[in-house]
């Protein structure tokens, strides 16, 4: 019992810590919202100031650019003359360099050919020398073997040997000589093979050298073709410059026409306006990127808060477990009291046990009554044993049912916790997916955002959802029609997954939350009378057993009611929130 109480205390502490963490997270979220609004206002002020400063600087820049252009035109004439002289000198240097490179390439190719020929001659001489040495070694070995054979024959001639052995020796010598001739032929064939292999290698080297020369000639041809193309392009550029000079000579602006000066002034004013609009567009685009990053950070915080809420223990489950624990404790205490009472009664019966009577005549007279009482007592004992067996069977069935119900509750609670964790993981993955889309395909994301206006669904109660609907319908009537028509046209090609956002807990932890009470597990105690065992002679143990049976029936009925209510409350009506952000909506989300 003490261990269970300690576990309950630890679980309560964990629940309190989780609630405190959620409260702190909510407070931090509100603080972050306030800081966000302050930063947004500051950024707006700084943006306006910077846009004004940038416009002034752009105007100064434009005037300075005009002055610089005049000076650049003065310098361009000098640079053009300098470039002409430099290009002529470069062209001459390139021609000389190409001639020298060609001469050097021809000389290098000749030297390479000579080196290759000398290498091939050297390899052939080395191979011939090697073959001759090998032949010399073989002939020396054959000479030594022949001398040894002659010496052996001379020694054997002196000895007495039969004619058959001599014939066999002669045949052996003939076979050895034939084998030696075959080996010589084989070696000559190997020498020829090596010579052919050497010739093949030399031919391959010549082929590689020829292919290299061919590639060099092709590169030279390509370089010549490129030089020809560059010359053509230079000729075209010169023709274009000549045409431009002729047009400038015929330009009426040079003659002082006032109409073209007015057009030039209007063009300059429009160019200034275009520059200012570009600067404003750049600043607004940067602000949009900052707000998008802030939205991603907020989504990550919401995902972490959802994960914390998933890790939090269910208060209804804890209350249910505590209630069952208290019932079991009461049952154990009642059983202990009954056991003590039975022990006291047993001791009292032993103390007050009647002594055997002394008179035998009185026993003989009262035998009839004692036999009758004994028969009644035996019948009552048999009935009591039968009832005990029935009660024990009923108790075992009730315990098995309660154990099965507890196991199902544990599994259901585990699946709910896993579902919450999966929701938080899904939220994080969606945020990461959006970040990757923005990182790798920002243009497509911007087009999708312009084409479609999404509505995020927040699972809030029906009363709050009705109030939110009344506030948002007035703001989003025209936009929703257009966006719905566009979405119906483009939904089959580009399906968009809508993220589910769960509202955070409020700052006040003591007040009961109606949303949590709806979503959490509820236990309803049925008021119907429990099923009772028919009347019979009861003992204190039987009374306790009947109570246990009643409690098991009641727990099973509570479990069925709880399941039906859970099935009813699975569906939760979503509320549509407009895409325009307001302070009230953001506070409600937090």
Swiss-Prot record:
Q: Does the keyword Coiled coil apply?
A: yes
What superkingdom heads the lineage?
Eukaryota
Q: Per the record, which residues fall in region Disordered?
A: 446-590
Entries under InterPro entries matching the protein: SPDLY_chordates, Spindly/BICDR_Dynein_Adapter
Tell whether Coiled coil is among the UniProt keywords: yes
Keywords of this protein's UniProt record, alphabetized? Cell cycle, Cell division, Centromere, Chromosome, Coiled coil, Kinetochore, Mitosis
Q: Where in the cell is it found?
A: Chromosome, Centromere, Kinetochore
In this chain, composition skew of type Basic and acidic residues spans: 483-497, 518-527
**Which residue windows are coiled coil?**
1-401
Q: Which residues lie in Polar residues bias regions?
A: 541-554, 572-590
Which GO terms of the molecular function aspect are on file? kinetochore binding
Cite the HAMAP family for this sequence: SPDLY (MF_03041)
Q: What does this protein do?
A: Required for the localization of dynein and dynactin to the mitotic kintochore. Dynein is believed to control the initial lateral interaction between the kinetochore and spindle microtubules and to facilitate the subsequent formation of end-on kinetochore-microtubule attachments mediated by the NDC80 complex. May act as an adapter protein linking the dynein motor complex to various cargos.
| Family, as annotated | Belongs to the Spindly family.
Q: Which PANTHER family match?
A: BICD FAMILY-LIKE CARGO ADAPTER, PROTEIN SPINDLY
State what protein this is by name.
Answer: Protein Spindly
């Amino acid at each position: 019992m003490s261990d269970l109480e300690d576990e309950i205390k630890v679980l309560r502490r964990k629940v309190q810590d989780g609630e405190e963490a959620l409260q702190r997270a909510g407070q931090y979220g509100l603080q972050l919202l306030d800081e966000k609004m302050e930063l947004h206002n500051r950024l707006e002020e700084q943006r306006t100031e910077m846009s004004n400063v940038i416009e002034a600087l752009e105007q100064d820049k434009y005037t300075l650019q005009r002055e610089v252009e005049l000076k650049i035109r003065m310098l361009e004439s000098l640079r053009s003359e300098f470039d002409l002289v430099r290009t002529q000198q470069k062209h001459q240097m390139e021609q000389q360099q190409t001639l020298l490179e060609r001469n050097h390439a021809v000389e290098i190719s000749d030297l390479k050919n000579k080196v290759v020929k000398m290498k091939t001659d050297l390899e052939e001489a080395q191979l011939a020398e090697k073959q001759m040495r090998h032949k010399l070694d073989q002939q020396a070995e054959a000479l030594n073997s022949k001398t040894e054979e002659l010496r052996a024959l001379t020694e054997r001639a002196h000895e007495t040997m039969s004619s058959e052995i001599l014939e066999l020796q002669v045949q052996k010598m003939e076979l050895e000589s034939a084998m030696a001739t075959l080996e010589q032929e084989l070696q000559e064939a190997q020498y020829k093979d090596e010579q052919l292999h050497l010739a093949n290698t030399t031919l391959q080297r010549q082929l590689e050298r020829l292919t290299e020369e061919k590639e060099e000639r092709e590169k030279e041809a390509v370089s010549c073709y490129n030089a020809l193309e560059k010359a053509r392009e230079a000729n075209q550029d010169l023709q274009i410059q000549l045409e431009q000079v002729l047009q400038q000579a015929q330009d009426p602006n040079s003659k002082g026409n006032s109409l073209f000066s007015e057009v030039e002034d209007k063009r300059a004013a429009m160019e200034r306006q275009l520059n200012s609009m570009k600067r404003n567009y750049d600043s607004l685009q940067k602000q949009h990127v900052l707000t998008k990053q802030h939205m991603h950070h907020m989504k990550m915080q919401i995902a972490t808060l959802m994960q914390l809420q998933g890790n939090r223990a269910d208060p209804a489950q804890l209350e249910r477990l505590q209630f069952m624990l208290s019932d079991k404790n009461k049952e154990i205490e009642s059983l202990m009291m009954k056991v003590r009472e039975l022990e006291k009664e047993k001791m009292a019966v032993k103390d007050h046990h009647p002594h055997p009577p002394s008179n035998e005549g009185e026993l003989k007279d009262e035998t009839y009554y004692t036999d009758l009482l004994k028969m009644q007592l035996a019948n009552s004992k048999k009935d009591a044993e039968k009832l005990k067996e029935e009660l024990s069977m009923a108790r075992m069935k009730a315990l098995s049912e309660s154990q099965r119900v507890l196991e199902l509750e544990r599994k259901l609670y585990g699946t709910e916790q896993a579902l919450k964790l999966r929701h938080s993981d899904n939220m994080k993955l969606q945020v990461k997916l959006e970040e990757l889309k923005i990182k790798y395909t920002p243009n497509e994301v911007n087009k999708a955002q312009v084409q479609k206006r999404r509505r995020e669904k927040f699972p809030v109660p029906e009363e709050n959802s009705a109030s939110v609907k009344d506030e948002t319908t007035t703001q989003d009537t025209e936009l929703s029609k257009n966006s719905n028509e566009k979405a119906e046209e483009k939904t089959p090609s580009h399906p968009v997954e809508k993220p589910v956002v769960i509202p955070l807990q409020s700052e006040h932890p003591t007040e009961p939350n109606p949303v949590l009470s709806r979503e959490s597990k509820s236990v309803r105690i049925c008021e119907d009378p429990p099923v009772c065992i028919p009347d019979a002679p009861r003992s204190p143990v039987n009374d306790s057993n009947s109570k246990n049976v009643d409690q098991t029936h009641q727990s099973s009925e509570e479990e069925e009611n709880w399941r039906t209510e859970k099935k009813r409350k699975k569906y939760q009506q979503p509320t549509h929130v407009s895409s325009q952000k307001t302070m009230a909506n953001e506070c409600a989300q937090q």
